[in-house]
Curated annotation (Swiss-Prot):
Pfam families reported for this sequence: AAA_lid_4 (PF17864), RuvB_C (PF05491), RuvB_N (PF05496)
Presence of keyword Glycoprotein: no
Protein source organism: Synechococcus sp. (strain CC9902)
One MF annotation (Gene Ontology) recorded for this entry: four-way junction DNA binding
Function (record text): The RuvA-RuvB-RuvC complex processes Holliday junction (HJ) DNA during genetic recombination and DNA repair, while the RuvA-RuvB complex plays an important role in the rescue of blocked DNA replication forks via replication fork reversal (RFR). RuvA specifically binds to HJ cruciform DNA, conferring on it an open structure. The RuvB hexamer acts as an ATP-dependent pump, pulling dsDNA into and through the RuvAB complex. RuvB forms 2 homohexamers on either side of HJ DNA bound by 1 or 2 RuvA tetramers; 4 subunits per hexamer contact DNA at a time.
Database matches in InterPro entries: AAA+_ATPase, AAA_lid_4, DNA_helicase_Holl-junc_RuvB, P-loop_NTPase, RuvB-like_N, RuvB_C, WH-like_DNA-bd_sf, WH_DNA-bd_sf
Protein name listed in UniProt: Holliday junction branch migration complex subunit RuvB
Gene: ruvB
Residue numbers spanned by region Head domain (RuvB-H): 273-347
Binding partners and assembly: Homohexamer. Forms an RuvA(8)-RuvB(12)-Holliday junction (HJ) complex. HJ DNA is sandwiched between 2 RuvA tetramers; dsDNA enters through RuvA and exits via RuvB. An RuvB hexamer assembles on each DNA strand where it exits the tetramer. Each RuvB hexamer is contacted by two RuvA subunits (via domain III) on 2 adjacent RuvB subunits; this complex drives branch migration. In the full resolvosome a probable DNA-RuvA(4)-RuvB(12)-RuvC(2) complex forms which resolves the HJ.
Tagged with keyword Glycosyltransferase: no
Free-text comment about domains: Has 3 domains, the large (RuvB-L) and small ATPase (RuvB-S) domains and the C-terminal head (RuvB-H) domain. The head domain binds DNA, while the ATPase domains jointly bind ATP, ADP or are empty depending on the state of the subunit in the translocation cycle. During a single DNA translocation step the structure of each domain remains the same, but their relative positions change.
Chain residue ranges for the region called Disordered: 1-29
Record localization: Cytoplasm
Binding site for ATP: 37-38, 79, 82-84, 188, 198, 235
């Protein structure tokens, strides 16, 4: 299976990545099949049992008919394995996987170039698909539905339409904001699946697997503590494990990493036993201390914290909501009794 990555080559603004930020750090955005921690097959993919069952049946049916897999939309919070699942699907289908992201498809020729170079039954993965431009979306409509490209050649009175036939292919789109997709684009996906936060048992299995792959020896309690502190997100679990490994190699050298060493490493990075970092606790503490627990509007909250409202809503809040530490009301955000207890314990 070939993996081809496409990007615009434009540098994004530099920002500090929090240890428990589910967005990928720069070094995590590079896909290296030879040293990747990603599973290769559905049987190796831990968690998301319903998703695996649905996609496994679809893959087996497509292979049995000798057809391309239907188009797939994967959505959910960042860091849960959407890109990994796309690579797994390509491996299961035995086809090439071409990887790009919506911001890289700025001009019509960018997406046209990708589509015309696809081989039969290839898989095209578009990350952040909700950020596609209107022109790119309109090019995808006939490509997804009728396997053709409708191109306009020339301008004004000399303009004419040229149609190019495309081979059967599978588009896998990934997004953290499924509601931002236009209805015409969303309706062209035959399989629409949500990835959920991972449970403790699955996360422990992921941490144990990663530890084995990177030759780190963990006690069961150490593995459990990392799993409990990763916000239900495999990407964060692997990142925490790397930071624990760093601290352990300096503090004790080689040897088994125990629960106490993990606790020391997480404390050093200001990550508590529930996966909250200093920014999360500051948000909850500000709501309680300055606003009596809320409600507080998103814009006000973002301004007080110096955060972008979209980042706050899509990256920070989902985990706090899932943990029952924060609630959204028509009047704004409010802390819960569980949040008050947690902040009191951390004080």
């Amino acid at each position: 299976m070939a993996i081809v990555s496409s990007s615009s080559g434009r540098k994004s603004p530099c920002r500090e990545t929090a240890l428990v930020d589910p967005q990928p750090a720069p070094e995590e955005q590079v896909i290296r099949p030879e040293d990747s921690l990603r599973p290769k097959r559905l049987s190796e993919y831990i968690g998301q049992s319903e998703l695996k069952q649905v996609l496994g049946i679809a893959v087996e049916a497509a292979l049995g008919r000798g057809e391309a897999l239907d188009h797939v939309l994967l959505y959910g919070p960042p860091g849960l394995g959407k890109t990994t699942m796309a690579l797994v699907l390509a491996e299961e289908l035995g086809v090439n996987c071409r990887i790009t992201s919506a911001p890289a498809l700025e001009r019509p020729r960018d997406i046209v170039g990708l589509l015309v170079n696809l081989q039969p039954r290839d898989l095209l993965f578009i990350d952040e698909i909700h950020r596609l431009s209107r022109v790119a979306e309109e090019l995808l409509y006939p490509a997804m539905e009728d396997r053709r490209l409708d191109l306009t050649v020339g301008k004004g009175s000399t303009a004419r339409t040229r149609t190019l036939d495309l081979p059967p292919f599978t588009l896998v789109g990934a997004t953290t904001r499924a509601g931002s997709l236009s209805s015409p684009l969303r309706d062209r996906f035959g399989l629409i699946q949500r990835l959920e936060f991972y449970g403790q048992t699955d996360l422990e299995a992921i941490v144990a697997r990663t530890a084995e792959l990177v030759s780190v020896d963990l006690t069961f309690d150490a593995c459990a503590r990392i799993a409990a502190s990763c916000r239900g997100t495999p990407r964060i679990a692997n990142r925490l494990l790397r930071r624990v490994r760093d601290v352990a190699s300096v503090r004790q050298g080689k040897g088994t990493i125990d629960d106490a060493m993990v606790a020391e490493a997480l404390s050093l990075h200001r990550v508590d036993h529930r996966g909250l970092d200093a920014s999360d606790r500051r948000l909850l503490a500000m709501l309680m201390d300055q606003h009596g627990g809320g409600p507080v509007g998103l814009e006000t909250l973002a301004a007080a914290l110096g955060e972008d409202p979209v980042t706050l809503e899509t990256v920070v809040e989902p985990f706090l909501l899932q943990q029952g530490l924060l609630v959204r009301t028509p009047r704004g955000r409010m802390v819960t009794d569980a949040a008050r207890s947690h902040i009191a314990e951390a004080a």
